[in-house]
Amino acid sequence: MVEYLIVILANLLVGGMIGLTGIAGFLLPMLYSGFMGMPAAQGMALSFFAFLISGVLGAWNYHRAKNLDVRLGLLISAGSLIGASLGVWLNLLMDESLVKRILYLVVLASGISILLRKDRDRKTGGREKLPAWGMVAFGLVTGALCALSGAGGPILVMPLLVVLGVPVKTAVGVALFNSIFIAIPSCIGYSLQ
């Protein structure tokens, strides 16, 4: 009974944080597999199910507020759908301790990208324009890394979009939308293990 209460409270707290900032999902795999001792695949499946729900609700709200660039989201998500499937497959081939290290590196990379954005703003202040194939490739790589590590998506996608010059609210909306396309193959893949 206590475990169910922890899961519900953690999902509500993390879901709220994801909706506000686009970041926080990385806490769930750590909680489930680390603190609660769930098998890694079960913790990942449960985490990605929560990411799916927060992605749908968050993307819908950002779309209604006109803070979702649907074209950009679809381009990134096309790559993420394939990348996430690849990430799940790679995760199942790797040692669990290596996967945890990758999660920590993804979180670190997210923080570094935020610092880079502050520095780049001072130098240029402009928005980078990447070609469509570049956005699909971006989605492929970030989808694979997020599904592999359990990071969810927005923790890596949102700050990198901001580094590329996407306005913060739009970056959060796109990252939440994209997290749906990372969560679907990840949730299914980890559930089947």
What do these predicted regions represent?
Residues 151:
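Conserved, well-structured core segments that form the ligand-binding/active-site neighborhood
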Residues 54, 110-113, 182-185:
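Membrane-embedded alpha-helical transmembrane segments of multi-pass integral membrane proteins
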Residues 148, 180-188:
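Hydrophobic alpha-helical segments of membrane proteins
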Residues 44-52, 172-183:
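Transmembrane helix-bundle signature of multi-pass membrane transporters/permeases
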